[in-house]
């Protein structure tokens, strides 16, 4: 969210950046002093749906203005548990095929706490740790409108389409 917002603000300094997603925790993230000037608003899918309903807008009746192909398939997979670490692992293997990548990805706050305690105790040295607060990842956030398995499938299809349609490969080359 923050990296994208900063990129937008760099190209368009007067832009208002709105993060729209299933994650209510992004609201807290956007309030951090280091983020406030980058992300102007955060709304969940549920909130956006309510806004559309209040205004009598049916998004399905609005014609698409085109597709965005400025993100990699790997980046679009971040919302599903394991997606962040998978993207990093794939990128490392692209540049350094012989490097072993130790990954621990966990879902849910209890599991995140456990793996962080293990890391603090030195039992996960050298590991890339991905912790998703919501079981299933961001697609299972409090502001999600559809069943989590459906959301995962949709994200996976977007990843597949992005990889296929993107002008560059997954690593920006």
Region spans (language model):
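Iron-sulfur-associated redox domains of electron-transfer enzymes in respiratory
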Residues: 1-173
